[in-house]
């Protein structure tokens, strides 16, 4: 009997590669859609009989799920974020958890962050809309600044944040400062980046702030009202990390007061959004639908990680990207 793989709520896994057919050479593979807020018990019942889960950003996999489903032996995230998986509960119940190593989507996300940065700074979307409405003569209102002349603050200096900083320093010659209490200052300075000691300090010194921190209790709404109201007036905010890093209500207030001059987001707190999403009323807000990692190169690398992880599990080989490896792991029972 073959092991079973559930691809849950992922529309991109295998879309541009032969990942599904490769898995099917050794496993039974099913695409499963569930509501993003499905209950843990209902989710556990839906996935009875599946041994491997290819997980997207939804739904959540918490204690109740692991307690109620004894079949799953490994969850593999089709991405690098793990905030929808209770890692402690997974370990407690003997379930391995794997995430795509950050380097697999580093270039894609970093490039998108810079693209959003330039779009917000140069008001590309607004200018395009103006032309489409016959406003070619309104060019003067889109006079902007050179990115090379500005200070960019990077929040989170890990795999992606450090690459964004490198692009800005070497490609544009921007002054870059960074805040990350978990990274040695020497690593920042080696890239020509100036470390700062707090979010408030970073906000006060930056013309543009780009978010690249992982989501945790410490970083939840790290850009709050205090941080926003301490910002240099006219600051631009870019977020390609997690929507929960930003306090949406405080951001709207900062936009209304002119403290924030433009925003470019690839993520929001509750995805997906509809036409009633509050920030859509602002012409100086650009939002893309969580596509920073959506390049063929990144998706191919992510698919490869997932196939390799499942095959290596079956072959009892080391698994790249493993973040939870319980001492007493569940056994695969066919």
Task: Show the residue positions of the predicted features.
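N-terminal glycine-/charge-rich "phosphate-binding" loop or analogous flexible N-terminal tail
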Residues: 1-52, 186, 314, 330-334
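Rossmann-like adenosine-cofactor binding region
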Residues: 48, 61-65, 174, 181-278, ...
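Phosphate-coordination loops involved in phosphoryl transfer and adenosine-cofactor binding
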Residues: 2, 72, 148-151, 225, ...
């Amino acid at each position: 009997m073959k092991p079973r793989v559930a691809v849950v709520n992922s529309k991109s896994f295998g879309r541009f590669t032969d990942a599904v057919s490769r898995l099917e050479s050794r496993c039974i593979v099913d695409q499963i859609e569930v509501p993003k807020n499905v209950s843990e018990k209902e989710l556990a019942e839906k996935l009875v009989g599946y041994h491997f889960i290819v997980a997207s950003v939804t739904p959540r996999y918490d204690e109740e799920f692991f307690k109620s489903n004894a079949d799953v032996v490994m969850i593999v995230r089709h991405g690098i974020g793990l905030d929808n998986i209770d890692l402690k509960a997974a370990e407690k119940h003997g379930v391995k958890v794997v995430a795509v190593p950050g380097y697999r989507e580093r270039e894609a996300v970093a490039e998108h962050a810079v693209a959003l940065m330039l779009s917000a700074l140069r008001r590309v979307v607004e200018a395009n809309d103006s032309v489409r409405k016959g406003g070619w003569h309104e060019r003067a209102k889109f006079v902007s600044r050179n990115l090379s002349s500005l200070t960019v603050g990077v929040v989170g200096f890990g795999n992606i944040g450090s690459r964004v900083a490198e692009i800005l320093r070497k490609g544009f010659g921007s002054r870059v400062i960074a805040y990350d209490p978990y990274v040695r200052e020497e690593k920042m300075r080696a890239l020509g980046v100036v470390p700062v000691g707090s979010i408030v300090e970073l906000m006060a010194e930056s013309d543009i702030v780009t978010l690249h921190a992982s989501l945790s209790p410490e970083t939840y709404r790290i850009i709050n009202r205090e941080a926003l109201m301490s910002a240099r007036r006219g600051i631009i905010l870019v977020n390609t990390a997690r929507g929960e890093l930003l306090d949406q209500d405080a951001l709207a207030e900062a936009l209304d007061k002119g403290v924030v001059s433009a925003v470019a987001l690839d993520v929001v707190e509750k995805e997906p959004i509809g036409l009633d999403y509050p920030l859509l009323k602002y012409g100086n807000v650009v939002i893309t639908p969580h596509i920073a990692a959506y390049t063929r190169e990144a998706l191919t690398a992510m698919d490869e990680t997932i196939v390799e992880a499942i095959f290596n599990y079956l072959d009892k080989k080391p698994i790249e990207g493993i973040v939870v490896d319980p001492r007493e792991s569940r056994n695969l029972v066919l």
